[in-house]
Amino acid sequence: REAEFRKQYEETEKYNLTSIASRPEVDGLIFYRPTRGMISSPFNAEKRHFGSDIAANPGESVLAILDGTVILSTYTAETGYLIEVQHNQDFVSVYKHCGSLLKREGDTVKGGEAIALVGNSGQLTTGPHLHFELWHKGRAVNPELYIVF
């Protein structure tokens, strides 16, 4: 009876989007923390908040979480200065509301390298912070499953 329950539970859990078991596997990747600070608003896909907000001091360095290539470095009215980096194993990291950008599209970056500075830019900002998103194979994933903030 217990074996049957366990099998049924495991079958159900593999489709559970909030389950830690649904975290994509990573081979040998060591993720850097994107900036110093505390999470002020966590990832919540149900509320369409596809990242973690990290309260930080303006001007604090924003770091690439992994080696990669900058695929977007721009300004938008809603999210202010933002930068996106493509990484190995189909990961993309997104950094929004920056005060300034230090890298351009096409630049190669190392994990832990400064790519921007924390700011308060864009209409959707709520004060100095970094809105950080992590995407894997085109789907938003909870950064807190990979990075210790």
Residue ranges: model-predicted function:
Residues 1-42:
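Polar/charged, compositionally biased leader and regulatory segments
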